[in-house]
Amino acid sequence: MGYSFGDFSGHVALITGGAGGLGSEAGLWLAAAGAQVVLADVDADALEHTAKRFGELVPGAPPLRPAQVDVTDSTSVRGLMRDVAASAGRLDVLVTSHGFPRDHRLLEMTDEEWSAVVEVCLTGTFICVREAARIMVERGYGRIVTLASRAWHGNPGQANYSAAKAGVVGLTKSVAKELGRSGITANAVAPGLIETASLRDLERFEQIAERARRDNSIKRIGEPSDVAAAIMYLASPEAGFVTGEVLHVSGGRFS
């Protein structure tokens, strides 16, 4: 599939979790549409690899800016946001695609497993949204797209991840109600099972994929491009009357 969706020329987009499968795909689509993309991730090596891919896949796009950041460190996030605004003069789009699961059944889940997931997935999203919103409010424009998950409905073995992603949905709806008067929209994309490299690396990948093909209304596993297309719409100027929504990209499997 080609990377094509609207015109983002002159726009600046910052994507957290930018070296991951979903974040990097969204970055490719935004860059191909003319946006100046800042890919932020805690993994410097993965960022370097992703930056090389960008040069090969979208050679005519504006220069990519990789940035190493820990989303749970408010000082680091604030510094990055301010640096982007100072150098580019604006910040139009924030996509928060960072996060990870650490699965265990409830009775076996440790405090550390709970805290680690909630800290990154929920608190990290709050910090990034808050700091981006400070810049967007000043300009009177912004598109905030958070990555939730189908798990926000509740998944067995994922009490931590499900709670964090449900929190992301609540956070997004609150932000939408607070910042709409400032020209800022906030929406969540809730992917189902998407075939990323990290999923393919699982020993049980084929079993997981077969179950998705069986249970989904659309009989296939999702692709990163499916999620990127949803992000692109919600990040676009044309989505100015859409806010506080959760867009499921799950092949019809909502819960």
Q: Over which residues does each language-model region extend?
A:
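Short, small/polar-rich loop/turn modules that mediate ligand/substrate recognition or access, typified
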Residues: 90, 95, 180, 185, ...
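Substrate-binding pocket helix/loop in short-chain dehydrogenase/reductase
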Residues: 105-106, 113-118, 208, 212
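C-terminal helical subdomain
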Residues: 188, 210-242, 251
